[in-house]
UniProtKB/Swiss-Prot annotation:
Lineage: Eukaryota, Viridiplantae, Streptophyta, Embryophyta, Tracheophyta
Biological processes, Gene Ontology terms: regulation of transcription by RNA polymerase II
Stretches for region Disordered: 1-145
Record key words, sorted: DNA-binding, Nucleus, Phosphoprotein, Transcription, Transcription regulation
Protein name, entry field: Transcription factor bHLH129
Gene Ontology MF term list: DNA-binding transcription factor activity, RNA polymerase II-specific; protein dimerization activity; RNA polymerase II cis-regulatory region sequence-specific DNA binding
Assembly notes: Homodimer.
GO cellular component annotations of the record: nucleus
Length: 297
């Protein structure tokens, strides 16, 4: 791929033939570009060196088949066979390419290369075209990307429009890509929603139910007893399952039964008295009964 030093020395002595050999050694004697066009053989003309010198706006030297802008430097010394990367100067696209102050559209052209012989001018190198324009040419209609109407969206938002629409399309009708797709979406502007929609949302959330099932549910909830007190739900008394709780409950049950019998036997015993007073009254009642039995001989 790198041309030898002998070919460069021959280029200074032999003229056009040596330049042709140098170009063939760098790019290859024959190339088959059947995907780009009809299969032809490459016959480079001797005017390649002059074309580079006459075109001052050329950015780098493009070799056939090279995807990047890295080319062979013809002004380099004969002792060096390295490749030099050349980038465009500052402000190159602003000066040499047309710009559109009102639009943001740009077009990307596919690389084109034609190789022919006979009366045709020399081979056109593979290159990518980057153009910023807003014209209505046939090339832009097929290879240009549609602009996003940001200015129109901002103007519509200022005029009180609630939402703006943006669409992206790819309607290329060439042999490279026959598929077409269209994607569209809508963006709601913040703070521009109507008050009617908010009021309808609040009314739906806090208004009375409308369906029959909801009405029946509300009636069941409204039928609350007047004497009921809202309290925390708790377990009923006497339903503890722990063994100690069960034993204590049984003991209290036996004591309550005995006191009831004692209340039946002892007169003038108030039910609100304590257990100690009830036992004292029971003992006094028993002593009185014993004294009556002893008096009756």
């Amino acid at each position: 791929m790198y041309p030898p030093n002998s070919s460069k020395s021959t280029a200074h002595d032999g003229g056009g033939d040596a330049d042709t050999n140098q170009y063939d050694s760098a790019a290859g004697a024959t190339r088959d570009f059947s995907s780009l066009g009809p299969q032809t053989h490459h016959h480079p003309p001797p005017q390649r060196q002059q074309q580079h010198q006459q075109n001052p706006n050329l950015v780098g030297h493009y070799l056939p088949g090279e995807p990047s802008s890295i080319g062979f430097d013809s002004n380099a010394s004969s002792s060096s066979s390295l490749f030099r990367h050349r980038s465009s100067p500052a402000g190159f696209y602003d000066q040499h390419l047309p710009t559109d102050p009102n639009g943001t559209g740009f077009s990307l052209g596919r690389p084109n290369g034609g190789y022919g012989g006979g009366g045709e001018q020399g081979p056109s190198r593979l290159k990518s075209e980057l153009r910023f324009s807003s014209g209505s040419s046939s090339h832009q209609e097929h290879n240009s990307l549609p602009r996003i109407s940001e200015v129109e969206a901002a103007a519509a938002a200022r005029n009180g429009v609630a939402s703006s629409s943006m669409s992206f399309g790819n309607n290329r009708t060439n042999n490279w890509d026959n598929s077409s797709s269209h994607i569209s979406f809508t963006i709601d502007q913040p703070g521009k929603r109507s008050k009617n929609s908010d009021f309808f949302t609040l009314e739906t959330q806090y208004s009375m139910p409308q369906t029959t099932l909801e009405m029946a549910t509300m009636e069941n909830l409204m039928n609350i007893p007047e004497d009921s007190v809202p309290c925390r739900a708790r377990a009923k008394r006497g339903f503890a399952t722990h063994p100690r709780s069960i034993a204590e409950r049984e003991r209290r049950t036996r004591i309550s039964g005995k006191l009831k019998k004692l209340q039946e036997l002892v007169p003038n015993m108030d039910k609100q008295t304590s257990y100690a007073d009830m036992l004292d009254l029971a003992v006094e009642h028993i002593k009185g009964l014993q004294h009556q039995v002893e008096v009756r001989p």
